[in-house]
Amino acid sequence: MKVLMLNGSPRKDGNTSIAVLDRLFYSSHFDKTMKVGASVVCARRGGCSATFDELNKYFTISNMPIASSQYWNSIHGREQGEAQMDEEGKQTMRVLARNMVFLMKSIALGKEKFGLPETEERVATHFIRERRRLLK
């Protein structure tokens, strides 16, 4: 099954999007491995890179390849229709779309020819180590 996931969020409403994604990624029980993901952010001026980074983390913890573009996948505008004037942002989105299609086709061909990468059972650890061993 081909699944494409595109996260989009206005910078000011990032926390709302994050709450939805937290629930979606926590409660969904389908394997997201090798499903292509991409994040797109819109802002008046700044803050795109932090939101973009936060949205992409859902993909990286789910074995999902991330489609990229020529720049961070952001577009700028404050009022309705202003993003249409962001020529660099629109070009970034067009390049992203082409790269996503290419990546999805490449993964499909690779899966057909080579299969999916071997998976491992997830191991959960923490960063605390036994202190006694270190002191000896």
Language model segments and positions:
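Solvent-exposed, flexible loop/coil residues
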Residues: 36, 75-80, 131-132
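Active-site oxyanion/phosphate-handling segment shared across diverse enzymes
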Residues: 48-109
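Short alpha-helical linear motifs
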Residues: 39-41, 59-61, 78-79, 115-119
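Helix-loop-strand module that forms the ligand-binding subsite of alpha/beta enzymes
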Residues: 1-14, 19-73
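N-terminal beta1-alpha1-beta2 submodule of the flavodoxin-like/Rossmannoid cofactor-binding fold
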Residues: 1-28, 84-136
